[in-house]
């Protein structure tokens, strides 16, 4: 369960690649499947046999500047808890929001409050990109996400 389309590539891909015994599905707080970023990331993961679900909440960069969520956080929290309920384990953002991102903190808090066991990402994306992923991130498949993903490389 992640906040944004690029988060799973930045923070979770090495774990997903090295734990292929799990039946993965990726759940996104923001964007809809039909929006360009949602569509691109859904196609990327579909090539790897992984389904995605997008809750469609707005990814407003001003949320970070204002330190406040601009979407209906009560509705979002309910949807996160409901969509995570069938799962035995959730891989998600850590409580500090990885690097303090308000949307990441929100997702982490919702997963924690759901009571479902969780594994959290490391606090810095660089460790995640270099922890031994089996399959290299093919950035040419993610032109709309490339710039953000590259910010987390060494």
Language model: regions and residue ranges:
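Active-site rim/loop-helix segments in enzyme catalytic domains that contact anionic ligands
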Residues: 1-86, 116
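Metal-dependent de-N-acetylase/amidase catalytic core
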Residues: 68-154
């Amino acid at each position: 369960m992640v906040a944004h389309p690029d988060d799973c590539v930045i923070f979770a891909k090495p774990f997903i690649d090295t734990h292929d015994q799990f039946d993965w599905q990726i759940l996104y707080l923001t964007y809809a499947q039909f929006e360009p970023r949602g569509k691109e990331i859904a196609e990327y993961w579909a090539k790897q046999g992984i389904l995605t679900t997008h809750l469609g909440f707005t990814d407003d960069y001003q949320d970070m500047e204002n330190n406040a969520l601009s979407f209906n956080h009560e509705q979002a929290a309910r949807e996160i808890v409901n969509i995570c309920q069938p799962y035995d384990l959730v891989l998600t953002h850590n409580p500090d929001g990885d690097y303090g991102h308000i949307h990441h903190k929100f997702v982490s808090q919702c997963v924690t409050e759901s009571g479902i066991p969780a594994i959290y990402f490391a606090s810095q994306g660089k460790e995640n990109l270099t922890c031994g992923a089996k399959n290299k991130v093919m950035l040419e498949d993610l032109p709309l996400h490339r710039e953000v993903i590259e910010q987390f490389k060494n």
